[in-house]
Amino acid sequence: MNPVTGSAAEVSRLADSPIEWRRAVGLTAETAVERGAALWQAAVTSVQAGELDDRTLYWQRLEQIFGLSERDARGFERSSRNYDPVFDADAQYRVLVTGFDPFHLDEAIEQSNPSGVIALQHDGRHAAER
């Protein structure tokens, strides 16, 4: 059963049981970190292609974290916010840019987060030394 396309009754039943929700969407401890990283990378690809909006990352993070155990949620959080980057060991300077911050989302749902977009735009890029 796909919880996104299932009947209202089925979705309601799954919403009452996080364990059932996890089974329905196929989310396990092993896939939580992978899905978080894939979610981040999809947002990077979208923004670097010119879609200057980070709200998809925000909403998908909220949807996918539902039903995770605390331990699994920590791994998902770290990977979906890009907290675990790989640094070049030879780099003289390292800057960690992470993403996700609701940025007035409650007051203006149509507004994306400029700092989130900037984090996504610069992911994986190297700055030249001056």
Language-model features, listed with the residues they occupy:
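N-terminal catalytic or cofactor-binding beta/alpha core of small enzyme domains
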Residues: 1-130
